Amino acid sequence: MGNYPSTSCGFDPYIFPTFDVEDLPVGLKFSMMLLTDDQSRLCRRLSEIGQEHIFDGWEKLPPDTRRAFGDYLETLDKRLGGIERYIHRMRRLLDRHRAGLSRWNGWDASPPSTSLLKLGEKEFEMAERVGCMKMGNVAFVLNATELGSHVGFNDALAKLEVDLTTDTSYLEYYIQHILAIQKRYGRPNKRVPFCILTSRKTYEPIKNFLSDNEHFGMAPVQIWLLRPSTDVPCFTDYTAKIFVDPDDRTKLPSIANGDGCFHALIHETGLVNEWEKLGIEYLYFFEGANSLAFQALPYMIYASIRDELVLNYLAVPRKPGEKTDAMVKLNANMHEVMVSLEHECLDEVLKICAFTKGDSICDEDGYSPFPASTHTMLVVLETYREVLKRTGGELPTTLMPTPSLEQDQKQFMEPVAAISRLTEISTILRPEQAAQVGITYMEAKFAYAPVRAPNKATTEMTDMPVYCSITAEVALYAFHRTILRSIGCRVEEGDEKEYNGLQLKPNPNLVFHPSFCLTVSDYRDRFQDPPQVYISKRSTMVVRGRSVLITSLHLDGCLSVDCEEGYNVKIRGKLQNGGWEIIPDDPGSTINMRGFKVNRKDKKYIYAGNSLSPCTIM
Protein backbone atom coordinates (compact mmCIF):
# COMPACT_ATOMS: atom_id res chain seq x y z
CA MET A 1 0.00 0.00 0.00
CA GLY A 2 3.05 2.24 0.13
CA ASN A 3 5.60 3.24 2.77
CA TYR A 4 3.52 5.42 5.05
CA PRO A 5 3.64 5.79 8.84
CA SER A 6 0.39 4.42 10.19
CA THR A 7 -1.65 3.69 13.26
CA SER A 8 -4.33 1.15 13.90
CA CYS A 9 -6.94 3.52 12.50
CA GLY A 10 -5.07 4.17 9.27
CA PHE A 11 -4.16 7.89 9.32
CA ASP A 12 -1.21 9.99 10.48
CA PRO A 13 -2.02 11.53 13.90
CA TYR A 14 0.66 14.18 13.71
CA ILE A 15 -1.05 15.79 10.71
CA PHE A 16 -4.55 15.43 12.13
CA PRO A 17 -6.07 18.88 12.76
CA THR A 18 -7.83 19.43 16.06
CA PHE A 19 -11.37 20.72 15.75
CA ASP A 20 -14.25 21.12 18.08
CA VAL A 21 -17.00 18.56 18.46
CA GLU A 22 -19.41 21.27 17.36
CA ASP A 23 -17.86 21.09 13.88
CA LEU A 24 -18.94 17.47 13.47
CA PRO A 25 -22.07 16.33 11.61
CA VAL A 26 -25.05 16.16 13.96
CA GLY A 27 -25.31 12.38 13.74
CA LEU A 28 -21.66 11.91 14.64
CA LYS A 29 -21.61 14.62 17.30
CA PHE A 30 -24.22 12.78 19.35
CA SER A 31 -22.47 9.44 18.87
CA MET A 32 -18.88 10.16 19.93
CA MET A 33 -19.42 8.90 23.47
CA LEU A 34 -20.44 5.50 22.04
CA LEU A 35 -17.19 4.99 20.11
CA THR A 36 -13.69 3.96 21.14
CA ASP A 37 -10.89 6.53 20.88
CA ASP A 38 -9.60 4.99 17.65
CA GLN A 39 -13.08 4.90 16.17
CA SER A 40 -13.70 8.53 17.17
CA ARG A 41 -10.50 9.66 15.44
CA LEU A 42 -11.34 7.64 12.34
CA CYS A 43 -14.90 9.01 12.09
CA ARG A 44 -13.68 12.57 12.62
CA ARG A 45 -11.15 12.16 9.85
CA LEU A 46 -13.70 10.68 7.48
CA SER A 47 -15.98 13.63 8.18
CA GLU A 48 -13.17 16.07 7.44
CA ILE A 49 -12.23 14.52 4.07
CA GLY A 50 -15.69 14.72 2.54
CA GLN A 51 -17.36 11.61 3.94
CA GLU A 52 -19.66 13.36 6.43
CA HIS A 53 -22.69 11.96 4.59
CA ILE A 54 -21.90 8.56 6.11
CA PHE A 55 -23.15 9.84 9.46
CA ASP A 56 -26.41 11.42 8.26
CA GLY A 57 -29.24 10.31 10.54
CA TRP A 58 -26.96 8.59 13.06
CA GLU A 59 -28.66 10.38 15.92
CA LYS A 60 -31.84 8.41 15.17
CA LEU A 61 -30.17 5.00 15.36
CA PRO A 62 -30.09 2.82 18.49
CA PRO A 63 -26.81 3.07 20.45
CA ASP A 64 -25.92 -0.59 19.80
CA THR A 65 -26.35 -0.05 16.06
CA ARG A 66 -23.98 2.93 16.12
CA ARG A 67 -21.41 0.98 18.13
CA ALA A 68 -21.61 -1.89 15.65
CA PHE A 69 -21.14 0.51 12.74
CA GLY A 70 -18.12 2.02 14.48
CA ASP A 71 -16.67 -1.49 14.79
CA TYR A 72 -17.36 -2.09 11.10
CA LEU A 73 -15.61 1.13 10.02
CA GLU A 74 -12.58 0.27 12.14
CA THR A 75 -12.39 -3.23 10.63
CA LEU A 76 -12.76 -1.86 7.10
CA ASP A 77 -10.01 0.66 7.80
CA LYS A 78 -7.60 -2.07 8.86
CA ARG A 79 -8.47 -4.33 5.94
CA LEU A 80 -7.87 -1.57 3.41
CA GLY A 81 -4.58 -0.57 5.01
CA GLY A 82 -6.07 2.82 5.85
CA ILE A 83 -9.42 3.94 4.48
CA GLU A 84 -8.20 7.53 4.07
CA ARG A 85 -5.37 6.47 1.81
CA TYR A 86 -7.76 4.24 -0.11
CA ILE A 87 -10.07 7.23 -0.70
CA HIS A 88 -7.12 9.37 -1.88
CA ARG A 89 -6.06 6.65 -4.33
CA MET A 90 -9.63 6.45 -5.60
CA ARG A 91 -9.70 10.22 -6.11
CA ARG A 92 -6.50 10.06 -8.14
CA LEU A 93 -8.03 7.35 -10.34
CA LEU A 94 -11.22 9.38 -10.78
CA ASP A 95 -9.31 12.61 -11.49
CA ARG A 96 -7.25 10.91 -14.20
CA HIS A 97 -10.36 9.42 -15.74
CA ARG A 98 -12.22 12.73 -15.68
CA ALA A 99 -9.22 14.35 -17.39
CA GLY A 100 -9.46 11.74 -20.13
CA LEU A 101 -6.16 10.14 -19.15
CA SER A 102 -5.77 6.41 -19.63
CA ARG A 103 -3.15 4.55 -17.61
CA TRP A 104 -1.62 3.76 -21.01
CA ASN A 105 -1.16 7.36 -22.14
CA GLY A 106 2.37 7.71 -23.49
CA TRP A 107 2.65 4.06 -24.46
CA ASP A 108 2.90 2.66 -27.99
CA ALA A 109 0.82 -0.40 -28.89
CA SER A 110 1.79 -3.21 -31.20
CA PRO A 111 0.35 -6.64 -31.99
CA PRO A 112 1.98 -9.56 -30.21
CA SER A 113 4.01 -12.02 -32.24
CA THR A 114 1.82 -14.96 -33.24
CA SER A 115 2.47 -18.30 -34.86
CA LEU A 116 -0.62 -20.48 -35.12
CA LEU A 117 -0.22 -24.06 -33.94
CA LYS A 118 -2.29 -26.26 -36.25
CA LEU A 119 -3.39 -29.86 -35.91
CA GLY A 120 -1.53 -32.16 -38.28
CA GLU A 121 1.66 -30.12 -38.45
CA LYS A 122 4.91 -31.66 -37.21
CA GLU A 123 5.38 -28.95 -34.61
CA PHE A 124 1.91 -29.67 -33.22
CA GLU A 125 2.88 -33.29 -32.57
CA MET A 126 6.28 -32.35 -31.17
CA ALA A 127 4.69 -29.74 -28.91
CA GLU A 128 2.38 -32.35 -27.44
CA ARG A 129 5.24 -34.76 -26.73
CA VAL A 130 7.39 -32.12 -25.06
CA GLY A 131 4.52 -30.59 -23.11
CA CYS A 132 3.23 -33.89 -21.78
CA MET A 133 6.60 -34.60 -20.18
CA LYS A 134 6.08 -31.60 -17.88
CA MET A 135 2.32 -31.77 -17.24
CA GLY A 136 2.82 -33.61 -13.95
CA ASN A 137 4.80 -30.64 -12.64
CA VAL A 138 1.93 -28.18 -13.00
CA ALA A 139 -0.30 -26.80 -10.23
CA PHE A 140 -3.76 -25.81 -11.41
CA VAL A 141 -5.49 -22.58 -10.38
CA LEU A 142 -9.18 -22.29 -11.28
CA ASN A 143 -10.88 -18.89 -11.25
CA ALA A 144 -14.30 -19.86 -9.89
CA THR A 145 -15.36 -16.43 -8.62
CA GLU A 146 -18.34 -16.03 -10.94
CA LEU A 147 -21.97 -16.83 -10.37
CA GLY A 148 -23.84 -18.04 -13.44
CA SER A 149 -26.74 -15.61 -13.17
CA HIS A 150 -25.59 -13.67 -16.25
CA VAL A 151 -25.91 -16.84 -18.35
CA GLY A 152 -29.20 -18.04 -16.85
CA PHE A 153 -27.72 -20.38 -14.21
CA ASN A 154 -28.50 -19.42 -10.63
CA ASP A 155 -25.50 -20.95 -8.89
CA ALA A 156 -21.71 -20.92 -9.02
CA LEU A 157 -20.75 -21.08 -12.70
CA ALA A 158 -18.28 -23.92 -12.03
CA LYS A 159 -21.26 -26.12 -11.05
CA LEU A 160 -22.86 -25.79 -14.48
CA GLU A 161 -22.95 -28.97 -16.58
CA VAL A 162 -20.37 -29.18 -19.36
CA ASP A 163 -22.66 -31.42 -21.37
CA LEU A 164 -26.14 -32.89 -21.04
CA THR A 165 -24.99 -36.26 -22.39
CA THR A 166 -23.20 -37.15 -19.14
CA ASP A 167 -24.43 -34.30 -16.88
CA THR A 168 -20.85 -33.67 -15.77
CA SER A 169 -20.23 -30.30 -14.10
CA TYR A 170 -17.28 -28.12 -15.05
CA LEU A 171 -15.75 -28.61 -11.61
CA GLU A 172 -15.95 -32.40 -11.89
CA TYR A 173 -14.70 -32.22 -15.48
CA TYR A 174 -11.63 -30.26 -14.41
CA ILE A 175 -10.91 -32.64 -11.54
CA GLN A 176 -11.17 -35.59 -13.94
CA HIS A 177 -8.46 -34.01 -16.08
CA ILE A 178 -6.17 -33.22 -13.16
CA LEU A 179 -6.47 -36.76 -11.81
CA ALA A 180 -5.77 -38.18 -15.28
CA ILE A 181 -2.67 -35.98 -15.57
CA GLN A 182 -1.59 -37.02 -12.08
CA LYS A 183 -1.92 -40.71 -12.93
CA ARG A 184 -0.23 -40.47 -16.32
CA TYR A 185 2.47 -37.86 -15.77
CA GLY A 186 2.68 -37.16 -12.04
CA ARG A 187 5.56 -38.06 -9.75
CA PRO A 188 5.24 -41.18 -7.59
CA ASN A 189 3.41 -40.50 -4.32
CA LYS A 190 2.94 -36.82 -5.25
CA ARG A 191 -0.47 -35.26 -5.68
CA VAL A 192 -1.02 -32.51 -8.25
CA PRO A 193 -2.23 -29.33 -6.46
CA PHE A 194 -5.59 -27.84 -7.36
CA CYS A 195 -6.30 -24.32 -6.10
CA ILE A 196 -9.81 -22.92 -6.51
CA LEU A 197 -10.30 -19.16 -6.32
CA THR A 198 -13.78 -18.29 -5.06
CA SER A 199 -15.73 -15.18 -4.16
CA ARG A 200 -17.96 -14.35 -1.23
CA LYS A 201 -20.92 -15.73 -3.21
CA THR A 202 -19.32 -18.86 -4.66
CA TYR A 203 -17.23 -20.11 -1.73
CA GLU A 204 -19.96 -21.97 0.17
CA PRO A 205 -21.70 -23.42 -2.94
CA ILE A 206 -18.40 -24.80 -4.26
CA LYS A 207 -17.23 -26.03 -0.87
CA ASN A 208 -20.51 -27.88 -0.31
CA PHE A 209 -20.57 -29.20 -3.87
CA LEU A 210 -17.14 -30.75 -3.40
CA SER A 211 -18.04 -32.19 -0.01
CA ASP A 212 -21.38 -33.60 -1.16
CA ASN A 213 -19.67 -35.37 -4.07
CA GLU A 214 -16.62 -36.66 -2.14
CA HIS A 215 -14.45 -34.18 -4.05
CA PHE A 216 -15.11 -36.18 -7.24
CA GLY A 217 -12.41 -38.66 -6.32
CA MET A 218 -9.69 -36.14 -5.55
CA ALA A 219 -7.95 -36.21 -2.17
CA PRO A 220 -9.19 -33.24 -0.08
CA VAL A 221 -5.62 -32.44 0.98
CA GLN A 222 -4.66 -31.53 -2.59
CA ILE A 223 -7.45 -28.98 -2.94
CA TRP A 224 -6.99 -25.40 -1.75
CA LEU A 225 -10.15 -23.29 -1.62
CA LEU A 226 -9.36 -19.57 -1.40
CA ARG A 227 -11.62 -16.57 -0.95
CA PRO A 228 -10.67 -12.93 -0.33
CA SER A 229 -11.33 -11.56 3.15
CA THR A 230 -11.67 -7.99 1.93
CA ASP A 231 -14.30 -6.40 -0.25
CA VAL A 232 -13.87 -2.77 -1.24
CA PRO A 233 -16.32 0.14 -0.86
CA CYS A 234 -18.00 1.76 -3.83
CA PHE A 235 -18.14 5.46 -4.67
CA THR A 236 -20.92 7.64 -6.05
CA ASP A 237 -19.23 10.61 -7.75
CA TYR A 238 -15.95 12.19 -8.83
CA THR A 239 -15.31 13.54 -5.31
CA ALA A 240 -15.08 9.90 -4.18
CA LYS A 241 -18.00 9.90 -1.79
CA ILE A 242 -18.44 6.44 -0.29
CA PHE A 243 -21.70 4.79 -1.31
CA VAL A 244 -24.15 4.33 1.57
CA ASP A 245 -27.11 1.98 1.19
CA PRO A 246 -30.13 4.30 0.79
CA ASP A 247 -32.37 1.69 2.40
CA ASP A 248 -30.08 1.05 5.38
CA ARG A 249 -27.75 3.85 6.46
CA THR A 250 -25.68 1.39 8.52
CA LYS A 251 -24.43 -0.42 5.42
CA LEU A 252 -21.69 0.54 3.00
CA PRO A 253 -22.26 -1.85 0.08
CA SER A 254 -18.99 -3.33 -1.14
CA ILE A 255 -17.84 -5.57 -3.94
CA ALA A 256 -14.97 -7.97 -4.46
CA ASN A 257 -11.90 -5.96 -5.40
CA GLY A 258 -11.36 -7.96 -8.57
CA ASP A 259 -9.76 -11.34 -9.09
CA GLY A 260 -6.33 -9.69 -9.07
CA CYS A 261 -6.39 -9.78 -5.27
CA PHE A 262 -5.74 -13.53 -5.39
CA HIS A 263 -2.07 -13.03 -6.18
CA ALA A 264 -1.69 -11.30 -2.81
CA LEU A 265 -3.78 -14.00 -1.15
CA ILE A 266 -1.65 -16.80 -2.63
CA HIS A 267 1.39 -14.95 -1.30
CA GLU A 268 -0.09 -14.50 2.19
CA THR A 269 -1.06 -18.16 2.51
CA GLY A 270 2.41 -19.40 1.58
CA LEU A 271 1.09 -21.74 -1.09
CA VAL A 272 3.94 -21.09 -3.48
CA ASN A 273 6.45 -22.48 -0.99
CA GLU A 274 4.31 -25.58 -0.46
CA TRP A 275 3.99 -26.17 -4.18
CA GLU A 276 7.70 -25.68 -4.70
CA LYS A 277 8.38 -28.47 -2.19
CA LEU A 278 6.16 -30.74 -4.30
CA GLY A 279 8.38 -30.17 -7.34
CA ILE A 280 5.91 -27.88 -9.11
CA GLU A 281 7.45 -25.87 -11.96
CA TYR A 282 4.42 -24.11 -13.46
CA LEU A 283 1.09 -22.62 -12.40
CA TYR A 284 -1.80 -22.95 -14.86
CA PHE A 285 -4.49 -20.30 -14.35
CA PHE A 286 -7.78 -20.94 -16.15
CA GLU A 287 -11.36 -19.73 -15.96
CA GLY A 288 -14.48 -21.28 -14.47
CA ALA A 289 -16.27 -22.57 -17.56
CA ASN A 290 -14.25 -23.47 -20.65
CA SER A 291 -14.96 -26.93 -22.02
CA LEU A 292 -11.59 -27.00 -23.83
CA ALA A 293 -9.51 -25.57 -20.96
CA PHE A 294 -7.10 -28.51 -20.71
CA GLN A 295 -6.54 -29.16 -24.41
CA ALA A 296 -4.06 -26.29 -24.77
CA LEU A 297 -1.88 -27.13 -21.76
CA PRO A 298 0.85 -29.29 -23.39
CA TYR A 299 1.24 -26.79 -26.22
CA MET A 300 1.57 -23.89 -23.77
CA ILE A 301 4.26 -25.77 -21.86
CA TYR A 302 6.08 -26.44 -25.13
CA ALA A 303 5.91 -22.77 -26.17
CA SER A 304 7.19 -21.68 -22.75
CA ILE A 305 10.17 -24.01 -23.04
CA ARG A 306 10.87 -23.18 -26.69
CA ASP A 307 10.71 -19.40 -26.22
CA GLU A 308 12.02 -19.32 -22.62
CA LEU A 309 8.84 -17.62 -21.38
CA VAL A 310 8.23 -16.92 -17.70
CA LEU A 311 4.61 -15.93 -18.40
CA ASN A 312 2.63 -17.38 -21.29
CA TYR A 313 -0.91 -16.33 -22.23
CA LEU A 314 -3.24 -18.49 -24.31
CA ALA A 315 -4.75 -16.55 -27.20
CA VAL A 316 -7.09 -17.42 -30.07
CA PRO A 317 -8.04 -15.60 -33.30
CA ARG A 318 -10.32 -12.62 -32.76
CA LYS A 319 -12.42 -10.50 -35.10
CA PRO A 320 -12.22 -6.69 -34.93
CA GLY A 321 -14.92 -5.36 -32.61
CA GLU A 322 -15.48 -8.73 -30.99
CA LYS A 323 -16.53 -8.35 -27.35
CA THR A 324 -13.65 -10.33 -25.92
CA ASP A 325 -10.53 -9.04 -24.22
CA ALA A 326 -7.48 -8.77 -26.45
CA MET A 327 -3.75 -9.32 -26.09
CA VAL A 328 -1.73 -6.17 -26.76
CA LYS A 329 1.98 -5.42 -26.47
CA LEU A 330 2.70 -1.95 -25.04
CA ASN A 331 6.03 -0.11 -25.04
CA ALA A 332 7.26 3.04 -23.26
CA ASN A 333 10.72 4.27 -22.26
CA MET A 334 12.40 1.04 -23.33
CA HIS A 335 9.97 -0.95 -21.19
CA GLU A 336 7.68 -3.57 -22.73
CA VAL A 337 4.60 -5.17 -21.25
CA MET A 338 2.09 -7.68 -22.63
CA VAL A 339 -1.42 -7.08 -21.32
CA SER A 340 -4.90 -8.49 -21.69
CA LEU A 341 -7.00 -5.40 -22.40
CA GLU A 342 -10.72 -5.37 -21.66
CA HIS A 343 -12.80 -5.05 -24.80
CA GLU A 344 -14.63 -2.02 -23.34
CA CYS A 345 -11.44 0.06 -23.43
CA LEU A 346 -9.53 -1.63 -26.26
CA ASP A 347 -10.63 0.71 -29.05
CA GLU A 348 -9.86 3.81 -26.97
CA VAL A 349 -6.43 2.56 -25.87
CA LEU A 350 -5.44 1.59 -29.42
CA LYS A 351 -6.35 5.07 -30.66
CA ILE A 352 -4.35 6.65 -27.84
CA CYS A 353 -1.41 4.41 -28.74
CA ALA A 354 -1.10 5.47 -32.40
CA PHE A 355 -3.59 2.99 -33.94
CA THR A 356 -5.87 5.69 -35.34
CA LYS A 357 -8.42 3.17 -36.65
CA GLY A 358 -8.71 1.58 -33.24
CA ASP A 359 -10.16 -1.92 -33.06
CA SER A 360 -11.22 -2.10 -36.70
CA ILE A 361 -8.13 -3.30 -38.56
CA CYS A 362 -7.95 -6.88 -39.77
CA ASP A 363 -5.78 -9.19 -41.82
CA GLU A 364 -6.69 -10.89 -45.10
CA ASP A 365 -8.59 -13.59 -43.20
CA GLY A 366 -10.72 -11.03 -41.38
CA TYR A 367 -9.01 -11.38 -38.00
CA SER A 368 -7.62 -8.66 -35.78
CA PRO A 369 -3.85 -8.52 -35.24
CA PHE A 370 -4.76 -8.33 -31.55
CA PRO A 371 -5.85 -11.89 -30.68
CA ALA A 372 -8.45 -12.76 -28.07
CA SER A 373 -7.37 -13.27 -24.50
CA THR A 374 -8.76 -16.48 -23.00
CA HIS A 375 -7.84 -15.51 -19.41
CA THR A 376 -5.63 -18.58 -19.37
CA MET A 377 -1.98 -18.28 -18.47
CA LEU A 378 1.00 -20.45 -17.60
CA VAL A 379 3.49 -18.98 -15.12
CA VAL A 380 6.92 -20.29 -14.16
CA LEU A 381 6.70 -20.90 -10.41
CA GLU A 382 10.20 -19.62 -9.65
CA THR A 383 9.44 -16.29 -11.33
CA TYR A 384 6.02 -16.08 -9.69
CA ARG A 385 7.57 -16.58 -6.25
CA GLU A 386 10.07 -13.77 -6.83
CA VAL A 387 7.35 -11.40 -8.06
CA LEU A 388 5.11 -12.08 -5.08
CA LYS A 389 7.97 -11.68 -2.62
CA ARG A 390 8.95 -8.35 -4.18
CA THR A 391 5.47 -6.86 -4.64
CA GLY A 392 3.23 -8.76 -2.25
CA GLY A 393 1.07 -9.52 -5.28
CA GLU A 394 -0.43 -6.02 -5.33
CA LEU A 395 -1.63 -5.09 -8.84
CA PRO A 396 -2.67 -1.77 -10.42
CA THR A 397 -6.38 -0.99 -10.14
CA THR A 398 -8.94 0.23 -12.65
CA LEU A 399 -12.43 1.69 -12.35
CA MET A 400 -15.36 -0.68 -12.64
CA PRO A 401 -17.82 0.09 -14.08
CA THR A 402 -16.22 2.89 -16.07
CA PRO A 403 -18.06 6.15 -15.19
CA SER A 404 -19.24 8.47 -17.92
CA LEU A 405 -17.07 11.51 -18.54
CA GLU A 406 -20.22 13.59 -18.94
CA GLN A 407 -21.36 13.04 -15.37
CA ASP A 408 -18.65 15.19 -13.74
CA GLN A 409 -19.86 16.20 -10.26
CA LYS A 410 -23.21 14.44 -10.57
CA GLN A 411 -23.79 11.03 -9.11
CA PHE A 412 -22.73 8.10 -11.24
CA MET A 413 -25.43 5.97 -12.82
CA GLU A 414 -24.21 3.14 -10.59
CA PRO A 415 -21.58 3.01 -7.83
CA VAL A 416 -17.98 2.66 -8.99
CA ALA A 417 -15.14 0.70 -7.35
CA ALA A 418 -11.43 0.16 -7.97
CA ILE A 419 -10.58 -3.41 -8.91
CA SER A 420 -7.57 -5.36 -10.11
CA ARG A 421 -7.41 -8.18 -12.65
CA LEU A 422 -5.76 -11.57 -12.30
CA THR A 423 -4.23 -11.49 -15.78
CA GLU A 424 -2.38 -8.22 -15.10
CA ILE A 425 0.40 -10.03 -13.28
CA SER A 426 2.49 -9.03 -16.31
CA THR A 427 2.39 -5.37 -15.22
CA ILE A 428 4.44 -5.97 -12.06
CA LEU A 429 7.24 -7.99 -13.63
CA ARG A 430 10.78 -6.67 -13.76
CA PRO A 431 11.79 -5.35 -17.23
CA GLU A 432 13.94 -8.42 -17.90
CA GLN A 433 11.02 -10.66 -16.90
CA ALA A 434 8.55 -8.66 -19.00
CA ALA A 435 10.74 -9.38 -22.03
CA GLN A 436 10.01 -13.08 -21.45
CA VAL A 437 6.23 -12.82 -21.75
CA GLY A 438 4.52 -14.25 -24.81
CA ILE A 439 1.46 -16.03 -26.10
CA THR A 440 0.52 -19.47 -27.37
CA TYR A 441 -1.72 -18.92 -30.37
CA MET A 442 -4.20 -21.69 -31.19
CA GLU A 443 -7.43 -22.16 -33.08
CA ALA A 444 -10.40 -21.66 -30.77
CA LYS A 445 -11.83 -25.08 -31.66
CA PHE A 446 -8.84 -26.68 -29.89
CA ALA A 447 -8.57 -24.39 -26.89
CA TYR A 448 -11.43 -22.02 -26.14
CA ALA A 449 -15.16 -22.61 -25.66
CA PRO A 450 -16.22 -20.47 -22.68
CA VAL A 451 -19.62 -19.76 -21.16
CA ARG A 452 -20.08 -16.01 -21.08
CA ALA A 453 -23.48 -15.13 -22.45
CA PRO A 454 -27.12 -16.26 -22.22
CA ASN A 455 -28.15 -19.16 -24.44
CA LYS A 456 -30.06 -17.25 -27.04
CA ALA A 457 -29.66 -15.29 -30.21
CA THR A 458 -29.93 -11.52 -29.85
CA THR A 459 -30.82 -8.69 -32.17
CA GLU A 460 -27.19 -7.54 -31.86
CA MET A 461 -25.79 -10.79 -33.28
CA THR A 462 -23.63 -10.45 -36.38
CA ASP A 463 -20.98 -12.87 -37.53
CA MET A 464 -19.23 -12.68 -34.16
CA PRO A 465 -18.66 -15.85 -32.11
CA VAL A 466 -21.27 -16.65 -29.47
CA TYR A 467 -19.94 -17.99 -26.17
CA CYS A 468 -22.66 -19.68 -24.12
CA SER A 469 -23.33 -23.08 -22.55
CA ILE A 470 -24.92 -24.42 -25.76
CA THR A 471 -21.95 -23.47 -27.93
CA ALA A 472 -19.47 -24.71 -25.30
CA GLU A 473 -21.15 -28.12 -25.21
CA VAL A 474 -21.33 -28.38 -29.00
CA ALA A 475 -17.67 -27.30 -29.22
CA LEU A 476 -16.68 -30.20 -26.97
CA TYR A 477 -18.50 -32.70 -29.19
CA ALA A 478 -16.98 -31.08 -32.28
CA PHE A 479 -13.48 -31.26 -30.80
CA HIS A 480 -13.70 -35.05 -30.44
CA ARG A 481 -15.13 -35.40 -33.94
CA THR A 482 -12.30 -33.30 -35.39
CA ILE A 483 -9.59 -35.37 -33.72
CA LEU A 484 -11.17 -38.66 -34.84
CA ARG A 485 -11.37 -37.45 -38.42
CA SER A 486 -7.76 -36.24 -38.28
CA ILE A 487 -6.51 -39.76 -37.49
CA GLY A 488 -8.64 -41.33 -40.24
CA CYS A 489 -11.92 -42.33 -38.57
CA ARG A 490 -15.10 -41.87 -40.59
CA VAL A 491 -17.37 -39.57 -38.60
CA GLU A 492 -20.44 -38.22 -40.33
CA GLU A 493 -21.34 -34.54 -40.12
CA GLY A 494 -24.58 -33.90 -38.25
CA ASP A 495 -27.44 -31.79 -39.53
CA GLU A 496 -27.58 -28.13 -38.57
CA LYS A 497 -30.46 -27.36 -36.23
CA GLU A 498 -31.77 -24.30 -34.44
CA TYR A 499 -31.67 -24.03 -30.65
CA ASN A 500 -32.70 -20.73 -29.04
CA GLY A 501 -32.15 -19.01 -32.36
CA LEU A 502 -28.62 -20.41 -32.76
CA GLN A 503 -27.75 -22.61 -35.74
CA LEU A 504 -25.66 -25.53 -34.40
CA LYS A 505 -24.47 -29.03 -35.27
CA PRO A 506 -24.38 -31.01 -32.00
CA ASN A 507 -24.37 -34.49 -33.57
CA PRO A 508 -22.84 -36.94 -33.37
CA ASN A 509 -22.28 -36.16 -29.69
CA LEU A 510 -19.04 -37.74 -28.50
CA VAL A 511 -17.77 -37.58 -24.91
CA PHE A 512 -14.40 -39.12 -24.09
CA HIS A 513 -13.35 -39.10 -20.44
CA PRO A 514 -9.75 -37.87 -19.91
CA SER A 515 -8.88 -41.31 -18.54
CA PHE A 516 -9.60 -42.60 -22.06
CA CYS A 517 -8.13 -39.83 -24.20
CA LEU A 518 -6.12 -37.02 -22.64
CA THR A 519 -4.04 -36.03 -25.67
CA VAL A 520 -4.27 -36.32 -29.45
CA SER A 521 -1.75 -39.17 -29.43
CA ASP A 522 -4.10 -41.09 -27.13
CA TYR A 523 -6.70 -41.19 -29.91
CA ARG A 524 -4.22 -42.93 -32.17
CA ASP A 525 -3.49 -45.48 -29.45
CA ARG A 526 -7.14 -46.18 -28.58
CA PHE A 527 -8.52 -46.30 -32.14
CA GLN A 528 -6.13 -48.88 -33.55
CA ASP A 529 -7.50 -49.11 -37.09
CA PRO A 530 -9.15 -45.73 -37.78
CA PRO A 531 -10.48 -46.54 -41.29
CA GLN A 532 -12.49 -49.35 -39.68
CA VAL A 533 -14.31 -46.89 -37.39
CA TYR A 534 -17.57 -45.40 -38.65
CA ILE A 535 -19.88 -43.22 -36.56
CA SER A 536 -23.19 -42.08 -38.04
CA LYS A 537 -24.44 -38.53 -37.66
CA ARG A 538 -27.19 -39.51 -35.18
CA SER A 539 -24.87 -41.43 -32.87
CA THR A 540 -23.80 -40.89 -29.27
CA MET A 541 -20.59 -42.34 -27.84
CA VAL A 542 -19.37 -42.08 -24.23
CA VAL A 543 -16.15 -43.80 -23.12
CA ARG A 544 -14.40 -43.86 -19.72
CA GLY A 545 -11.29 -45.88 -18.87
CA ARG A 546 -7.70 -46.03 -20.04
CA SER A 547 -7.77 -49.70 -21.04
CA VAL A 548 -10.42 -49.42 -23.75
CA LEU A 549 -9.28 -50.34 -27.26
CA ILE A 550 -11.41 -49.89 -30.37
CA THR A 551 -10.23 -52.07 -33.23
CA SER A 552 -13.28 -51.66 -35.46
CA LEU A 553 -16.69 -50.10 -35.00
CA HIS A 554 -19.75 -49.35 -37.07
CA LEU A 555 -21.93 -47.26 -34.76
CA ASP A 556 -25.44 -46.09 -35.54
CA GLY A 557 -27.01 -45.38 -32.17
CA CYS A 558 -25.72 -45.00 -28.62
CA LEU A 559 -22.71 -46.77 -27.08
CA SER A 560 -21.52 -46.17 -23.52
CA VAL A 561 -18.36 -47.86 -22.19
CA ASP A 562 -17.19 -47.72 -18.57
CA CYS A 563 -13.96 -49.56 -17.77
CA GLU A 564 -12.51 -49.61 -14.26
CA GLU A 565 -8.80 -49.72 -13.46
CA GLY A 566 -7.39 -53.22 -13.89
CA TYR A 567 -9.88 -54.29 -16.54
CA ASN A 568 -9.74 -54.21 -20.33
CA VAL A 569 -12.38 -53.65 -22.97
CA LYS A 570 -11.95 -54.32 -26.69
CA ILE A 571 -14.54 -52.98 -29.07
CA ARG A 572 -15.11 -54.45 -32.50
CA GLY A 573 -18.18 -55.00 -34.61
CA LYS A 574 -21.41 -53.28 -35.53
CA LEU A 575 -23.95 -51.65 -33.22
CA GLN A 576 -27.31 -50.22 -34.16
CA ASN A 577 -30.05 -49.15 -31.76
CA GLY A 578 -32.58 -46.40 -31.11
CA GLY A 579 -29.86 -44.21 -29.64
CA TRP A 580 -30.05 -40.87 -27.91
CA GLU A 581 -31.36 -37.76 -29.57
CA ILE A 582 -30.75 -34.09 -28.89
CA ILE A 583 -34.09 -32.37 -29.29
CA PRO A 584 -35.28 -28.78 -28.87
CA ASP A 585 -36.69 -27.90 -25.46
CA ASP A 586 -38.29 -24.93 -23.77
CA PRO A 587 -35.28 -23.10 -22.29
CA GLY A 588 -37.34 -22.12 -19.27
CA SER A 589 -38.00 -25.74 -18.36
CA THR A 590 -34.38 -26.81 -17.84
CA ILE A 591 -31.99 -25.66 -15.16
CA ASN A 592 -29.30 -25.22 -17.79
CA MET A 593 -31.38 -22.94 -20.00
CA ARG A 594 -29.86 -24.56 -23.10
CA GLY A 595 -32.91 -24.85 -25.25
CA PHE A 596 -32.42 -28.56 -25.88
CA LYS A 597 -32.43 -31.82 -23.97
CA VAL A 598 -31.22 -35.38 -24.51
CA ASN A 599 -33.92 -37.93 -25.24
CA ARG A 600 -32.37 -41.19 -23.97
CA LYS A 601 -34.29 -43.73 -26.01
CA ASP A 602 -31.91 -46.67 -26.25
CA LYS A 603 -28.23 -47.53 -25.66
CA LYS A 604 -25.69 -50.31 -25.42
CA TYR A 605 -23.88 -50.13 -22.07
CA ILE A 606 -20.63 -51.98 -21.42
CA TYR A 607 -19.24 -52.02 -17.89
CA ALA A 608 -15.99 -53.75 -16.96
CA GLY A 609 -15.28 -53.70 -13.28
CA ASN A 610 -16.87 -56.58 -11.41
CA SER A 611 -16.77 -59.47 -13.85
CA LEU A 612 -14.55 -62.52 -13.42
CA SER A 613 -12.93 -61.87 -16.77
CA PRO A 614 -10.65 -58.83 -17.02
CA CYS A 615 -11.44 -58.50 -20.72
CA THR A 616 -14.79 -57.62 -22.27
CA ILE A 617 -15.36 -57.77 -26.02
CA MET A 618 -18.42 -56.29 -27.68
Predicted regions and their residues:
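N-terminal regions that are enriched for targeting/export leaders
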Residues: 145-147
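Domain-scale recognition of functional cores that engage charged ligands
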Residues: 114-139, 150-420, 425-426
